[in-house]
Amino acid sequence: MSRGIIIIGSGFAARQLVKNIRKQDAHVPLTLIAADSMDEYNKPDLSHVISQSQRADDLTRQLAGEFAEQFNLRLFPHTWVADIDADAHVVKSQDKQWQYDKLVLATGAAAFVPPVAGRELMLTLNSQQEYRACETQLRAAQRVLIVGGGLIGSELAMDFCRAGKTVTLMDNAASLLASLMPPEVSSRLQHRLTDMGVHLQLKSQLQELEKSEAGIRATLASQRRIEVDAAIAATGLRPETALARRAGLVINHGVCVDSYLQTSHPDIYAIGDCAEINGQVLPFLQPIQLSAMYLAKNLLGGKAPLKLPAMLVKVKTPELPLYLAGETQRRDLSWHITAESDGMIAKGMSGEGQLRAFVASEDRMKEAFALLKMLPV
């Protein structure tokens, strides 16, 4: 490959892919282009920055230049890719262009901000760059509204509460983690957050944010008003697909790829939070790590279909940590819950009596690995 491989993006997926490529080929030309600084940080740490009094710069693990030297790369930080000419195999920015043999989209996902009046007052914590932009406000804030009771919202609510802040956690659903598990399973976390002092506003919808003398006034659809110092959107992620769409690639929720991580164009691939693998968007670390292993082989001339085993997802809520695995969101499962003082095991069983999902908390989390082996692949 005389022109080599170009990767657009510099997050976890891009870095894992670089490491896997270099394990197999030390010399193929590798170029990374990204809009950020390309310094490495651990994105899950963003869920704990406030309680641990970390500044954005504290999260940096490796500078971009060190990464480039270690893995023999060309890096183009702070560079927005404007267009891809898929037929000509050319990537274009405003003032540069690069030719490639193979192209990988690792463009990630953007935080979704609800389309309410005053949405510009809402903060997001989806990157080191976003945290850097709002860290002074967040550290000073005493009253915090978090909109969204999913994984990130629950993690942030616990973290801000542990830091001594007054936290209101709001969601349209009747329970936390509603898209991941039934309320009888998530209720243990819900009670723990309430016991810690988090104010839950479930079955509630944000209608408007506006500046007030006391900070920010949040008005709910019920017309209840809450005065806060900061409002955070934790209402999910949307895969970054605009560049792929302009290149003429097939898009659904994410950039559509097959088991080889190949898009609708044979020389363009996608990985990470932007990719939709055979109909599934999997924005978790383990599937990204495995995707990087297989994609590296495919980029270097192999033909290795991605095989994903049953995988654990960890909810990073230190006062009540959780593992979940399998099809926890299925509505037709029968849940068998054993809850004791040291933790909980909830097993989701099919009508045929087969284990299809489970959730484990606290000291019972050590049982998760044995249960994982019982899940169908």
Swiss-Prot record:
<dbReference type="GO" id="GO:0005737">
    <property type="term" value="C:cytoplasm"/>
</dbReference>
<comment type="pathway">
    <text>Nitrogen metabolism; nitric oxide reduction.</text>
</comment>
<dbReference type="Pfam" id="PF18113">
    <property type="entry name" value="Rbx_binding"/>
</dbReference>
<keyword id="KW-0560">Oxidoreductase</keyword>
<comment type="similarity">
    <text>Belongs to the FAD-dependent oxidoreductase family.</text>
</comment>
<keyword id="KW-0963">Cytoplasm</keyword>
<dbReference type="Pfam" id="PF07992">
    <property type="entry name" value="Pyr_redox_2"/>
</dbReference>
<dbReference type="InterPro" id="IPR036188">
    <property type="entry name" value="FAD/NAD-bd_sf"/>
</dbReference>
<dbReference type="InterPro" id="IPR050260">
    <property type="entry name" value="FAD-bd_OxRdtase"/>
</dbReference>
<keyword id="KW-0274">FAD</keyword>
<comment type="function">
    <text>One of at least two accessory proteins for anaerobic nitric oxide (NO) reductase. Reduces the rubredoxin moiety of NO reductase.</text>
</comment>
<dbReference type="InterPro" id="IPR023753">
    <property type="entry name" value="FAD/NAD-binding_dom"/>
</dbReference>
<dbReference type="InterPro" id="IPR041364">
    <property type="entry name" value="Rbx-bd"/>
</dbReference>
<keyword id="KW-0285">Flavoprotein</keyword>
<keyword id="KW-0520">NAD</keyword>
<protein>
    <recommendedName>
        <fullName>Nitric oxide reductase FlRd-NAD(+) reductase</fullName>
        <ecNumber>1.18.1.-</ecNumber>
    </recommendedName>
</protein>
<dbReference type="InterPro" id="IPR023961">
    <property type="entry name" value="NO_rdtase_NorW"/>
</dbReference>
<dbReference type="GO" id="GO:0016731">
    <property type="term" value="F:oxidoreductase activity, acting on iron-sulfur proteins as donors, NAD or NADP as acceptor"/>
</dbReference>
